[in-house]
Amino acid sequence: MANERDNKYIDEEEVYNKSLLDQHLLDNDIDAFRDEFLGMHTYEQSEYFEDSDDEIRQRIFEVLSPEEVADFFEQLEFEEEEYDPLFDTMNANYASKVLENMSSDNAVDIMNQLSKQKVASMLTLMNKEDAKEIKALLHYEEDTAGGIMTTEYISLKVTTLVKEALMHVKEQAPDAETIYVIFAVNDHKQLVGVLSLRDLIVAENDAYIEDVMSERVVSANVADDQEDVAQKMRDYDFIAMPVVDYQDHLLGIITIDDILDVMDEEASEDYSRLAGVSDVNAKHDSVFKTAGKRLPWLITLTFLSMITATLIGSFEDTLSKVALLGAFIPIISGMSGNSGTQSLAVSVRKISTGEINEQSKFLVALREAGSGLISGVVCGILLIICIVVLHRQPILATIVGGSLTAAMTVGTLMGAVIPLIMNKLNIDPAVASGPFITTINDIISMLIYFGLATTLMSYLI
């Protein structure tokens, strides 16, 4: 019973038995495998495929049609370097048919991870219409609106009658990414309006599309950054957004499922950078590869930390006179780093969601500095009380408490201001990672602490 439970992959409501599916394939019980596998959700199918070894994957290709494989390939979440080896195990004709049957944007996402030779081979084997469509999309940068759009949408000329439009929608629906939003174009294929399926259904049959459509169209330029597009779609609560070129020609659409992927990707990327690592989602990396990705940041921070160590060493005289000062170094530097990291997270989040503009930058910095000051005063007073009670040294307590207050105030301000400066310079603010801010704040807090201690040394001895 325990073994059976271990072999079950559960996604809240859906349950499938991986071992049983594997056994069906290995026993060549094709009908049983197809019945169970094709009855699963495409997400579960992709999970099963990702968790399978090469032998099982090869059997899957043998018993499923390219159309059936294409359905769950839409959901695959492999690392970039895993796609080439995967396609090496597939027959070239079979692989090209799989890509043909995928939505164009998802097919392009996969092809962007393949070698140029494989892409050229796939395009040669695909039918001309699909190959032409995918070639056009491959020209766009991956992280732009053009890179995530699909060309499978429904558009209507403004001079089309509603009754004709309904027939057109019915014909195009099977291949369209969405039918709920329909775009109106003029004779030059320029975007001039938008209407919903509901608008079309309730309109009079003899009305023209230009009479039904809304001319207030919000669109994305093909070169817009995907993060900006995601923010715009979230602001307007769209399920689909048209993508146009610089002359307003309709090129494609971006749907909400693509935007959810973008938001997840951007959030993971920002989180990775804040943590000082290259990719928190690299679940298949070896320990050596993981270490290799993290070492550049760690080596940089090691050298930055040497500045802190050198700084503390330069105050050797002060430490030799009052050795107890050394006991509070971790508190001062740690709290300064903690407050800076909190402020950094808030600042980066506000920048990424578009909450900060030119007018509000000063207010954000002022608010964070005020928050740091209040937190610093409270923590400083508590620390003063503890030192007085434990060590009976009010002057030392005042120096440590005052340093903590100043360090937390400056640390919080640094955490807020550095991302704002980076954003102003068009540098991703998430690069100002937590470890980086912490190390910078260590240097500043030690300057404050030992500077104040040295200044008031005559009162300590």
Language-model-derived ranges and their functions:
Residues A2-V277:
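Hydrophobic packing positions in regular secondary-structure scaffolds
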Residues T42, W297-S305, F328, I332, ...:
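Alpha-helical transmembrane segments in multi-pass membrane proteins
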Residues K132, D258-T290, T341-A365, L420-N426:
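Non-transmembrane, extramembrane segments of multi-pass ion/lipid transporters
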Residues H284-P296, T300, I312, E316, ...:
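Alpha-helical membrane-interface segments at transmembrane helix boundaries
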Residues T302-L319, L382-R392:
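Juxtamembrane "helix exit" motif at the C-terminal ends of alpha-helical transmembrane segments
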Residues S314-I329, H391-G402:
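Membrane-water interface of transmembrane alpha-helices in multipass transporters/channels
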Residues V388, F450-I461:
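Transmembrane alpha-helix termini and helix-breaking/packing motifs in multi-pass membrane transporters
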Residues M422-N441:
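Interfacial loop-to-transmembrane junctions
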